[in-house]
């Protein structure tokens, strides 16, 4: 049982870490592409900014879902009998 709990804790930490890493990379790419687009066509800045914040909000949901799944596996572990 202790081995199972330890492995679940490690798996949850990896799940949360990779979710946060992917989101950080996504935010970096999103911000860079936004700046490139605004530099090319400044008149579209308000429309692009609205879309950027919408996508950023959706992108931010990924680590929150990962944290929820990780906490579920830690506290309500279905693998322990």
Curated annotation (Swiss-Prot):
A GO CC annotation given for this chain: proton-transporting ATP synthase complex
Cross-referenced NCBIfam families: ATP_synt_c, PRK06876.1
Organism: Acinetobacter baumannii (strain ATCC 17978 / DSM 105126 / CIP 53.77 / LMG 1025 / NCDC KC755 / 5377)
Entry's transmembrane regions: 7-27, 55-75
Predominant place of localization: membrane
Description of how the protein assembles with itself and partners: F-type ATPases have 2 components, F(1) - the catalytic core - and F(0) - the membrane proton channel. F(1) has five subunits: alpha(3), beta(3), gamma(1), delta(1), epsilon(1). F(0) has three main subunits: a(1), b(2) and c(10-14). The alpha and beta chains form an alternating ring which encloses part of the gamma chain. F(1) is attached to F(0) by a central stalk formed by the gamma and epsilon chains, while a peripheral stalk is formed by the delta and b chains.
Name of this protein: ATP synthase subunit c
Similarity comment: Belongs to the ATPase C chain family.
Name of the coding gene: atpE
Mode of membrane association: Multi-pass membrane protein
Physiological role: F(1)F(0) ATP synthase produces ATP from ADP in the presence of a proton or sodium gradient. F-type ATPases consist of two structural domains, F(1) containing the extramembraneous catalytic core and F(0) containing the membrane proton channel, linked together by a central stalk and a peripheral stalk. During catalysis, ATP synthesis in the catalytic domain of F(1) is coupled via a rotary mechanism of the central stalk subunits to proton translocation.
Record key words, sorted: ATP synthesis, Cell inner membrane, Cell membrane, CF(0), Hydrogen ion transport, Ion transport, Lipid-binding, Membrane, Transmembrane, Transmembrane helix, Transport
Site-annotated residues for Reversibly protonated during proton transport: 60
Highest taxon of source: Bacteria
Gene Ontology molecular function terms on file: lipid binding; proton-transporting ATP synthase activity, rotational mechanism
């Amino acid at each position: 049982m202790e081995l199972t709990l330890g492995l679940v804790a490690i798996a949850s930490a990896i799940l949360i870490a990779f979710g946060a890493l992917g989101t950080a990379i996504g935010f970096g790419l999103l911000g860079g592409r936004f700046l490139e687009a605004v530099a090319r066509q400044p008149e579209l800045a308000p429309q692009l900014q609205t879309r950027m914040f919408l996508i950023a909000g959706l992108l931010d949901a990924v680590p929150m879902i990962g944290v929820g799944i990780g906490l579920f596996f830690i506290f309500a572990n279905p693998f322990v009998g």
